[in-house]
Amino acid sequence: MKEYQVYLERARSRQQDFLYPLIFREYIYGLAYSHNWSRSIFLENGGYDNKYSLLNVKRLITRMYQQNHLIISANDSPKNGFWGYNKNFDSQIISEGFAIVVEIPFFLQLSSSLEKAEIIKSYKNVRSIHSIFPFLEDKFTYLNYVSDIRIPYPIHLEILVQILRYWVKDAPFFHLLRLFLYHFSNWNGFITTKKSISTFSKSNPRLFLFLYNFYVCEYESIFLFLRNKSSHLRLKSFSVFLERIFFYAKREHLVEVFAKDFSYPLPFFKDPNIHYVRYQGKCILASKNVPFLMNKWKHYFIHLWQCFFDVWSQPRTININQLSEHSFQLLGYFSNVRLNRSVVRSQMLQNTFLIEIVSKKLDIIVPIIPLIRSLAKAKFCNVLGHPISKPVRADSSDFDIIERFLRICRNLSHYYNGSSKKKNLYRIKYILRLSCIKTLACKHKSTVRAFLKRSGSEELLEEFFTEEEEILSLIFPRDSFTLHRFYRNRIWYLDILFSNDLVNDE
């Protein structure tokens, strides 16, 4: 990322605060090529490819400007027009350039703020994935109600471009960006389908992720302001906040107006115990207070998405549930709060009392059905969870095959060690072990029994022990109480930077 600063400083010397000239810089597409190559460990470095050259980009942009995008028919075939047969290929080139160019100024702002130790106050509550797990354990047992919310999707890309315009002032750049988005999939209509959004996100992941993150950041900035000022808000006054262009300029004035008009205390509308957690496109809203306040926030969310982001969201899509009666899914786990009831006998003099004690315990369970569905999609088992042999390359060695299965098994064990019940995790590990054995037996054109007899089943299966299991098995006997206690306890590892790939298929 350090080279970004050099390139932007070079461009700033020519034109202040403009991103459009960077689109026509050769080094931008050199960075795009380097980024694409570094994402995969299976690709060989064949040098700087001609497809990322500046000459190709200029030709594509020239053809885009020559098209009359105002009369594009919604029934035009994607194979027609200026894209020709290389539509996806050409769009990826420009998309990578757009993504890198728009990332540069925001990365520089972030790096400068970190160097000066200036953390933006409005984002002081932003945490990494590490904080979500202890949050569930420490806070959720004291809460009563929860809303499992999926951020509305899809959203029209024009809204995403408008959000970006509030932060970057460069009309030619956004004109070219709109032209690219309209030409890509005929997004000049009023309705954006999930299929078109999915196609764009897969073929242009970096640009789509950047635009989508901006959308989430914008919605959360408004939500945090509403949360901080919730004691002065009423639902009928919510539309005042939806003029986003002058939002920051009006914010202080609005606070003064609310303090003047609603000077009497409104403790009934305050909700200091509300908690908000988000990861990717899903968020959890939990509270200890009465459902009325949760219902208020539910309508805030719906009006925000409908009035400001033009995303239709119906009230019935957001349900308010009691934690003791509802399980919610987050980060690949099924979580709920279980009530443990116990009766204690108390005696005072000659009188005996029975006291019922209710304690709450957080249950975090590995979702077996979504994981089996993901393993079946990856050809490790069938839809019923029966292990099958996975097709491999003929020149793959036994060591490479075993190492590939071991990596997947250890990653899953590492990620799901925080579960309170590991029975489902052991089943997933069993599927991977047996699938590995069947794959090796199929490669050697042998049966599973004959292959295990020849290679030694015990040594092969012990390869699937995680590093923690290997260390503890050397310290404690296999049947010791300490080792069994280790298997039962939840352990969160701090080196988890993102959710497992199989979790993203949920």
Curated annotation (Swiss-Prot):
Annotated Gene Ontology cellular component terms: chloroplast
Entry's localization field: Plastid, Chloroplast
Keywords linked to the UniProt accession: Chloroplast, mRNA processing, Plastid, RNA-binding, tRNA processing
GO MF annotations in UniProt: RNA binding
Biological process annotations from GO: mRNA processing; RNA splicing; tRNA processing
Domain of life: Eukaryota
Pfam family, any one: Intron_maturas2
Homology family: Belongs to the intron maturase 2 family. MatK subfamily.
Protein function: Usually encoded in the trnK tRNA gene intron. Probably assists in splicing its own and other chloroplast group II introns.
Protein name as catalogued: Maturase K
Protein's organism: Trifolium incarnatum (Crimson clover)
